[in-house]
């Protein structure tokens, strides 16, 4: 979706640049994942992604397109319209994460991962990586959300099936809608 980059990411990129995250802003590109199955499930799934990071970032739910009885191109065009609207909404939520300060980002990340029931081993590893890289000083919900993107990368390195990775990514995208202040508490939490 290179031709749509400016339309979809313009405001988000400007905020990233204003916060000194120019490298990230220059790498991001909107993308689409198209998944179909031959196991009797008569639908295809289309989902919005942010490409350009180490691992694509899933930023919303999947839009299903029923393809039994010979679906037509119009069915997919309708799904792409829904996906485009969802993408804009999700990028807006991602931008809002930049405005949410976290006093205890490691605790917040741990609580969010636990709340979303993310795989414990990979989540603990991602939390440790974040803590080594940034410590436990003040941060933003955006920084923590981006650090959480290590979890699918770790799972992929462990040869997790694509189906499980897709479910994990969809679940992680729910973090865009959380009230992060509820998770930013001083008391340490174990996973």
PLM features per residue range, with description:
Residues 3-191:
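Intrinsically disordered, low-complexity regions enriched in serine/threonine
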